Curated annotation (Swiss-Prot):
This is Galactose-1-phosphate uridylyltransferase. Keywords: Carbohydrate metabolism, Cytoplasm, Galactose metabolism, Nucleotidyltransferase, Transferase. InterPro entries: GalP_uridyl_Trfase_II, GalP_uridyl_Trfase_II_CS, GalP_Utransf_C, GalP_Utransf_N. Pathway: Carbohydrate metabolism; galactose metabolism. Belongs to the galactose-1-phosphate uridylyltransferase type 2 family. Its EC number is 2.7.7.12. It comes from the Bacteria. It is found in: Cytoplasm. It catalyses: alpha-D-galactose 1-phosphate + UDP-alpha-D-glucose = alpha-D-glucose 1-phosphate + UDP-alpha-D-galactose. NCBIfam families: PRK05270.1-3 (NF003630).
Amino acid sequence: MKIIEKFADEVINSGAYEPLDRVYVINKIRALVGDHDEEEENDQPAAKQLVDLAVKNEKIPDDITSREVLNDQLYDLATPTPSKTNSIFWQKMQKSSEENTDWFYKLCEDNNYVKKEAIAKNVVFSGTSSKGHSLEITINLSKPEKDPKAIAAAAHATGKKYPQCALCLENEGYLGGYGKNARSNLRIIRMNIAGRPWGFQYSPYAYFNEHCIFLDQKHIPMVINQQTLINLVEIEKIFPHYFVGSNADLPIVGGSMLAHEHYQGGRHTFPMMKAGIKKNIMFDSYPKVVAGIVDWPMSDLRLTSDNSLDLIDLGSKIIKFWDNYSDTARDIKAYEGETRHHTVTPIMHREGKNFVLDLVLRDNNTSEKYPLGIFHPHKQLWHIKKENIGLIEVMGRAILPGRLKSELEEVKKYWLGEDNKMAASHKEWADQVKAENEISLDNVDQVMEQSLVEVFEQVLQDAGVFKNNADGEEGWDKFITALTKEIK
């Protein structure tokens, strides 16, 4: 069968068009890839073959961006319009929230918005650190390399951006181009969260199962306050099978998109969610809320209750108290003049009827010794992880840069005494690991995985405000004493 005809059949079978529309669909495809058609010759998806055909027909230049833009234009044909997508989604919602997210996620996989093939390239494994914490490690290989033309375009970009950012509603159906994300096949579910219009979409390069984004339809900065907790509860009521959380709203400890209010969620049980309570806390005015300090490398207070109003009220008071709490002996400073340094990373999930809220305490102070952040991965870890510790990593899933896949292969050669091109930045760590282990061809992969787990444990320890040692426990006690005195 000819490639154009095959893809036209796929478009019609998707339900986006009717059989009567076949000639129309074929002409839409021809407008994108050229009139010359060919017999399919391999097992590659028809859309991918059509992109190759478009290059051959000189409809597009042969570069990463042009291929990506055309790919998404083709899959847009196989995707219901935004209004139809929303209509189907909310019809299914009447039966089951799981059924409608199953349907929407499959749609986003089938139309290649969720890059399933690229995501499968990621390195993923888990392990238990010497401190007893279960952790997950990923090396991110799914995002495509930067197109040189896109880099140049971004460097020379002037004037007002459209869309204003990568999370704005205006991305839905946006063609994209050099320096701009292709989003022809993006669909966003419209929803109401606590009286405000929000959107719900999936992440194209997912870091975990059904990785989704909830975004304010208005381009406003991120903020963590009582409204945040209200919003998280509202989302959990709609999607109880998903967790939802927010990155912190300050630089260094926050995510990379502070300019647009949004949350992340999905269907994944992170290590932090499975971690137990190491010390219970009593709040007399909140008998329906079970509270405690979580046994975790970062500083996490957990609140659990089937009464969401109590949870929101107590959680908001804890956030406000932390925002103004200082312990200068431990470099914990709430303010420097008018500059706020404290916030939290709030994360919520459901356990039956209970709402479980984790409030991870964050501090973005810097010092001469730690210019990138006192509570940020320290310099000896930068060869593995230098980037900010955001929501996903807070919960125990490392997102490590793609460069490490090849670099760590060279480290393994070094351990085995083979010729290698190991980066100098890894040498001190590699020597330490080698001195502590009998490394052979049989166990070198296991040693590498365990060593990365230990590095990630230390990354999280560095980001925690109260360390997992005697001094950290004293710091926790001092904080909890002051907190429970303030909140009866």
